[in-house]
């Protein structure tokens, strides 16, 4: 078959990598580079050249089995990483606030005042209680129950909720704290359990040596697919068992036997002027939220106490309407084993940008937002796969991570290959 793939992130690239062995595959990417969230930036840091990831950064072999196999196939070199977590509401004030990190007893009580805070001790006690419930308790909660309601029902304190669990979830999914309260509790708990976030013995995290772009290069080199960058798909029309793909607002199109939409749900919907009611419902129920991302060296956007600095740093702040602002600073030195002589941070949604003279780059990444409607849409996704020779994939079909994007594409590859096999047998009989 002649197959069009729209989007060159993990889902589109993986689908092309697998399907190009038996099909003629063309990948359309609107940007000038391939990789999607696999975005490595070259930084000139006082004359030192450093490659830094700004999107996909880490994985582990337990929860990313497909990606692990792919890296083995491509002979991708990786290094051990770190996934420590810190909380700070003191980073931008002269005194007070709260800071702690889970690295050790010393970092938990790096702010010595925590030793004398009953609410802090209560939070630590409730972390243990939460882990016990998650690991051994009854998780038969209604799939529609929100995390906020679940925490209230189990009588967890505001300190535990606001200084630990909600910030961690907000950091993981790049989601506002308020939205985390609406996150389905059952899905949240299952994610924590599957990723062993409730265990002492956690999986070893790894990062791609030289940056995530290195695996993208190797994947593209090992496929016969035709990758077209700077080729923005502006419309897709499906008729007469064929698919017409329009590029760069030109009134010309290429014709294919099938199309794989490996883009964000809202992007896919914008291309389809003939989406049926089911496609419209499923794709519109999985929404995206834009995030502002800065690559910089401004220490003001890290916890005040350097002892607390962790791989992931949740910075708690509020806007003028008293709404909580989700700001996360990734300490890239710890995540990518970069010499600490060159402090580098990737910060999402800071209340104020880092100093311009300390900034290496600004980017915008959209992340899927998960609620009851989103998970319901995922469960119905198979009902539209293959209809009118169209398939849909992306990290949005899982929990929003690299492995989810790969597995989503793998399901489509399996579906297309099985249909192709059945058709071959039918034609031969």
Question: How should each PLM-predicted stretch be described?
Answer:
Residues 42, 103, 322-429:
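Conserved flavin/dinucleotide-binding core of flavoenzymes
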Residues 232-366:
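Mid-domain catalytic core of redox enzymes
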Residues 41-67:
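N-terminal glycine-rich dinucleotide-binding loop that anchors FAD/FMN and/or NAD(P) in oxidoreductases
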Residues 2-27:
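N-terminal Rossmann-like FAD-binding beta1-loop-alpha1 element of flavoenzymes
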Residues 188-246:
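Helical element adjacent to the flavin cofactor pocket in flavoenzyme catalytic cores
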Residues 20-44:
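Glycine-rich FAD pyrophosphate-binding loop
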Residues 61-182:
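Mobile amphipathic helical/loop "lid" adjacent to a hydrophobic cofactor/ligand pocket
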Residues 11, 33, 266:
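Conserved Rossmann-like nucleotide-cofactor binding loop
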